[in-house]
Amino acid sequence: MAKTRSPSTPPAPERVAAFQTGISAETRAAAFLMAKGYRILARRFKTPYGEIDIVAQRRKLIAFVEVKARARLDDAAYALTPRQQQRIIAAAEAWLVANPDHATYELRFDAMLVAPKRLPQHLPAAFDASP
């Protein structure tokens, strides 16, 4: 059985730090994408199936971007598991149901690797939705 904490118990400091690191990395990634000409359509889009860190558009392309923050870019590159990819794909399908006007756009699943004191590394088409 999964552990649950009471609503009055504050989260552990390491969880708070990880959350703040994630928010900071997503902000850096979004700024980097905007500098490359993307428009940010959504951040932290939550569904029952999973969450998409960033949904970005450039022309007729929609990019579903997973942001991975680690101490080193090499470590971040290996942090996107097949299970996470499936959850992101399912969440992207939910986003498209909620945003049908984008259904005819080209769709792509990207990764953005973020490490301290380094520019984010954008990996277009990091994975695809084919089985």
Curated annotation (Swiss-Prot):
Signal peptide: none annotated. Pfam families: UPF0102. This is UPF0102 protein RPD_0400. GO terms for molecular function: nucleic acid binding. Belongs to the UPF0102 family. SUPFAM superfamilies: Restriction endonuclease-like (SSF52980).
